[in-house]
């Protein structure tokens, strides 16, 4: 680990972490806002998250972005100092020191909502299909509900996991104006179609799409994949074939959640748009 730096020190911690675009994103935010910082990657052993965080703190570290597989451990580390979003998600992707203690928030869902709004989606009263019932899905439920979605239907290959997520959400203190239901992948349809379909699975990393029935999309609906790539993902291609008016990948969500973390740490909200444009160009150039 590097020596203490005179600059405010931040990092992304995970395993693996070499692929992370967070250093590039936060460097651009730093230049944009005039907030100087040092931002690095921290590779933690799978069984060494707490020790790596402690060493980072002892060397002057002030804040961390947390990626797989440590988001649940980060939630435990922050203990009683969790935001409402983090409490409902059961996971933390942003840590910062305040009054000698680690505080935690989950900015993933805010990143998704901000990108959906950037794309012109009207979430107030929207019907949303959420595909997947893991941590990625759990992390976006509260922000989607808070944005005014009328219904969120969770479907998963294991229907029981979807039902468990919906039940846990209700038990944790759900947003009462949003109806949250669950079922199997085959139960993904709804009369009139969905306004937004979000793929919260990692299927696109394997070049596959979830096994969804046809006829899912309302007119002008958006299909959104949390994964991102230089070209449309398997889920995006499936959605276009099924009649989705528009598709988008998760690069904007990545930049959006990073912008929210930057705001928490530095008290200023950066503009995600030029950063997203630069990252997209980088993706295409490497293709």
UniProtKB/Swiss-Prot annotation:
Record's GO cellular component terms: cytosol
One GO BP annotation of this record: shikimate metabolic process
Residues of the active site: 71
Catalytically driven reaction(s): shikimate + NADP(+) = 3-dehydroshikimate + NADPH + H(+)
InterPro entries cross-referenced by the UniProt entry: Aminoacid_DH-like_N_sf, NAD(P)-bd_dom_sf, SDH_C, Shikimate_DH, Shikimate_DH-bd_N, Shikimate_DH_fam, Shikm_DH/Glu-tRNA_Rdtase
Annotated keywords: Amino-acid biosynthesis, Aromatic amino acid biosynthesis, NADP, Oxidoreductase
Coiled coil (UniProt feature): none
Family: Belongs to the shikimate dehydrogenase family.
HAMAP family, per database record: Shikimate_DH_AroE
The protein's assembly and partners: Homodimer.
Function: Involved in the biosynthesis of the chorismate, which leads to the biosynthesis of aromatic amino acids. Catalyzes the reversible NADPH linked reduction of 3-dehydroshikimate (DHSA) to yield shikimate (SA).
Identification of the protein by name: Shikimate dehydrogenase (NADP(+))
Native species: Bordetella petrii (strain ATCC BAA-461 / DSM 12804 / CCUG 43448)
Gene for this chain: aroE
